[in-house]
UniProtKB/Swiss-Prot annotation:
GO terms for biological process: glucose catabolic process; glycolytic process. One of its GO terms (molecular function) is manganese ion binding. This is 2,3-bisphosphoglycerate-independent phosphoglycerate mutase. Catalyzes the interconversion of 2-phosphoglycerate and 3-phosphoglycerate. GO terms for cellular component: cytoplasm. The keyword Manganese applies. Belongs to the BPG-independent phosphoglycerate mutase family. Its EC number is 5.4.2.12. It comes from Natronomonas pharaonis (strain ATCC 35678 / DSM 2160 / CIP 103997 / JCM 8858 / NBRC 14720 / NCIMB 2260 / Gabara) (Halobacterium pharaonis).
């Protein structure tokens, strides 16, 4: 075994105050690594990862930059640039969707996450679509998915009010349904959740109805449900079930939490345990959600050339990607630059995430089982390079539960200690880092913080003998520097397409 890259998803370096679950946790394994190894910090937000200034990073962007070895201009930025340049209406895939609705006297259905979180969508993109519908004279409706995970738990009503103002000015785009992302954006094959969002959109069947979208969210708060958990709700006066005469524009720019609902709406590989019969609407996705989906894409991927996986394959290295199912896409699709298919010599071992409503109920998640599997691989069929993601700091951090997040950090630390011992015994270099912060700011019980942070993340390097090897970590590093660092450490030439630089210096 040559090297292991361990990604502590959501483990940021905060202020160490009462909101910082990372600092509050007992982390003897990580602390020992940081003491023995070469230790530094990396930036994971804004322009350092191809996002607008000040925009917090996320797991998709983080893994994409880690794998690319260079700063990758994000799809969200491409969309925004077109809107700002006044050429958004010229997009061919979007134009065809509007043409379909216009030619068949149908509607365009906009659906996606309505918030300013910037992780899965921008509300400005939805507002631009509403304005475009008005310009085209096409009737439009919106299926609004509320956030509360990448934004404050009860901020959704404000975003809905902003949308209502745009709709009123445009004269189209009324909200037809409201649904929390817990249902509409599941990514762990909890198909019964997806089906509830599907039924509201396609059949206008939902447990609740409200006079307005704002009232729908307010009623959810009254029931004790925050934005993420808003149950599917129909908005009265907008009788707009989905039909074959209609078009759909799914405006999320991030793929992983959009796939399930798109699969159900387009009847792609229906392996769920109930029958669905969606109408043959013209469906367009803002970005490519899956390269196997035969659907029009408004902004096809600009895949990074020669990501880490490709370079390892070209050098005849074997590699193993490991995570629990919540982070499957990140250690495979995103790390590989938007490629679903494994590279030559790349194996994948994904452990199921626990079947619980929210991960504060099981902060350890599947970290022990994931570590067991990794140690088994290292002992029996060790890859040349292991990439492993621990999901806990991010997934539990999103619940806003400080004590659960603290427990999640401690659970990961325990497993990191076990894994580090196995890697050292196998003679591997160890790199430990994170893709963004989260558990480093949990807010307060009165005002829980469930979103990512813009804090830096750790970067720790240990030689096969568990020391810093005389190296230090330079200042000013970003996620784009990780792949070049790993490659140079194991003696693989860094391709010209990787503009990142090694983080290690003597």
């Amino acid at each position: 075994m040559e090297a292991a890259l361990v990604i502590l998803d959501g483990w940021g370096l905060g202020d160490g105050d009462e909101t910082d679950a990372v600092a509050a946790a007992d982390t003897p394994a990580f602390d020992a690594l940081a003491e023995r190894g070469a230790t530094g910090q990396l930036e994971t937000h804004g322009r350092s990862v191809g996002l607008p200034d000040g925009q917090m990073g996320n797991s998709e962007v983080g893994h994409l930059n880690i794998g690319a070895g260079r700063v990758v201009k994000q799809d969200s930025t491409r969309v925004t640039d077109d809107i700002d340049a006044g050429v958004f209406a010229d997009n061919e895939a979007l134009a065809r969707a509007f043409d379909h609705a216009d030619d068949h006297d149908g509607r365009v259905h906009f659906m996606g996450l309505v918030s300013d979180g910037g992780v899965h969508s921008y509300q400005s993109h939805l507002h631009a679509l509403v304005d475009l519908a008005a310009e085209r004279g096409v009737e439009a409706v919106t299926h609004a998915f509320t956030d509360g995970r990448d934004t404050a738990p009860k901020s959704g009503v404000g975003f809905i009010e902003d949308l209502a103002a745009t709709v009123e000015e445009a004269g189209t785009g009324d909200v037809a349904t409201v649904c929390g992302r817990y249902y509409a954006m599941d990514r762990d094959e909890n198909w019964e959740r997806t089906k509830r969002a599907y039924d509201a959109i396609v059949h206008r069947e939902a447990p609740h109805e409200a006079d307005s979208a704002v009232a729908a969210v307010a009623a959810s708060y009254d029931r004790g449900d925050t934005d993420e958990y808003v149950e599917p709700t129909l908005v009265s006066g907008t009788d707009a079930p989905l039909s074959a005469d209609d078009a759909v524009v799914f405006f999320n720019f991030r793929a992983d939490r959009a796939r399930q609902l798109v699969r159900m709406l387009a009847d792609i590989d229906p392996d769920w345990a109930f029958e669905t019969d969606p109408p043959a609407a013209a469906l367009v996705t803002m970005t490519e959600y899956d390269e196997t989906f035969d659907l029009p894409v408004a902004y096809p991927p600009l895949a990074p050339e020669q990501p880490l996986g490709a370079v390892l394959a070209e050098s005849d290295r074997t590699q193993l990607r490991m995570a629990e199912s919540e982070k499957y896409a990140h250690v495979t699709y995103f790390l590989n630059g938007g490629r679903e298919v494994a590279f030559e010599g790349e194996r994948r071992d994904i452990v199921d995430s626990p079947d619980v409503p929210t991960y504060d109920e099981q902060p350890a998640m599947s970290a022990p089982e994931l570590t067991d599997a990794a140690i088994d691989h290292i002992g029996a069929d060790a890859p040349d390079v292991l990439v492993l993601n621990y999901a806990n700091p991010d997934m539990v951090g999103h619940t806003g539960d400080f004590e659960a997040a603290k427990a999640a950090i401690e659970a990961v630390d325990e497993q990191l200690g076990r894994l580090e011992s196995a890697i050292r015994e196998a003679g591997g270099h160890l790199f430990v880092t994170a893709d963004h912060g989260n558990a480093d700011d949990m807010g307060t019980p009165e005002a829980p913080h469930t979103a990512h942070t813009t804090n830096p993340v750790p970067f720790v390097y240990c030689t096969p003998d568990g020391t810093d090897g005389g190296y230090t970590v330079r200042d000013g590093g970003t996620l784009a520097d990780i792949a070049p660092t790993l490659l140079s450490t194991i003696g693989v030439d860094i391709p010209e397409t990787m503009t990142g630089e090694s983080l290690l210096e003597r």
